[in-house]
């Protein structure tokens, strides 16, 4: 394809603002016109289970069920509630019940590992506290060792609250044939309010806390904010999730011992921040508890799939390099997994008897060649400068990637499918070790240029040499290439990144990424992974993020046939399952759509008091479903008002009020919260 010097110059200039690595010292705008909307911050009819229900980590005989209780007075507890599991949406055919407790130490979250279940079975569950019922959730156990003909998974990643509406979650909730939703990380983002997202939504989708999150209380509050999104609630309600974290659950471009977006000292210690982020994750996500707080694990889906979930962030990753010419990049001991996890992965691959070995992980695994975009640059070393921007992915750890691919090849392991998130793009790759040769040559017009040529490792026409395939899911909402570099630039890059590039009639630099069979750098959404005895197929679906919408479009489908280990295009999405489960009902048990005889519908919810007890700073986290006059005071045990904290008109939304009580005496205090004519009270203790 022909292009112009102007294109290469523009692309190079744009690349100086890293297309994926974000930093909180820069305001990133998405300048698109949007229709202003303002949905409720919580559903008062769901009290005290405002955050809905969820399930996760299904095994053949058990599954995690989750909820969050929101006590009206935010006492520390403990609070006792009951749960039940049934085979019908009305929760009439109950097969198990039990009681459990929660308290402030768990941020009032609840997890139950329900055992003794039947394999490959759809169940419905719910919680009750003080006579009030939660939403009913739907979940499904894995088939275990049993034979299974077809599996379907929704695959998602990168849901930035302020970048757009979670419409893709809504569409996944509408599906009745999913075995689970696989979330590959960046479930939340750590940035301060108004820093990273769509500026037209900063008011509409306000973040709490408003600052960058660092402490346990701040991570908890951010999860609480996300989990009040109705689309996310519905997705969790209707399908079990299987999750791993990526970097933004802690901080941007994190690794074992630090992160690009962490300043040691000024933001506390990385050890403390990482520990707080992990604790909040395990509290708010329906993942099975492990004392080690590790997230790499495997789940068997019958004879068809072994699902192997990896942690390429916090478990063992060494710090990212910033120079592709560094000798360290080819150090054979350099690791993104850590020694223990890598050995565990290799053993799982070698010992698997399942037809498909599906690896869920975070960052792009395949070789990703982008240095050619520097052709118009007069900067010495422009090729290396561009390539050095993309070392957070497996390209920054090439020797470990080679070791894994050698293991697959030498052990003749077929049907390996790699699932990838993180990059905010859709990709389908044939996975081969060094699928293209790159050499730098002198050119009188462009200076040093990369020339790409085929080699014996991989044949792009036949797929020979590939040992696996990789499917990358787009972001739910997080910024794509067009939102970082402009739509025109992204469209041109999308058209050229895996095609022959000819800057002028006399210069052909070849195809930099012939193993990349599908690319979309612009759209948001998810893909459905469909697995049968014949194929593993990814179907990409895209939806708008700038307005609430239930619309979506099917884009493309790519698949690998049994033992092919390379991709071919499919003409249509995989068909739905013939047997589909009934959806969980939209309202809690006993609640109908038309509620009568309510004189003063609830408009306020106290979502958290962090921490309690506290020493200096306390946060009051609350939500309004409508605008109201808010008056919040702090009283001591004698009834004397110590401080008026807030007295103003407040729009509906989610808020956190910070109180510095460092000069107060130790003891018991009470918040008095007046919302128009409604009065609430909450006790806190200063130690």
Task: Briefly describe each language-model feature range.
Residues 1-4, 686-687:
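Positively charged n-region of N-terminal signal peptides that target proteins for export
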Residues 6-15:
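Bacterial N-terminal signal peptides
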Residues 21, 135-138, 643-644, 648-649, ...:
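C-terminal tail/sorting-segment detector
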Residues 23-113, 117-592:
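Long, structured stretches of catalytic cores involved in phosphate-ester chemistry, encompassing
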Residues 67, 422, 594-634, 656-662, ...:
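Glycine-centered coil/turn sites that cap beta-strands in beta-rich domains
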Residues 80, 122-124, 619, 656, ...:
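Short, conserved beta-strand segments of beta-strand-rich sandwich/propeller modules, principally
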Residues 108-112, 653-659:
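Short strand-edge motifs at loop-to-beta-strand transitions and within beta-strands
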Residues 119-120, 615-616, 626, 651-652, ...:
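Surface-exposed loops/turns
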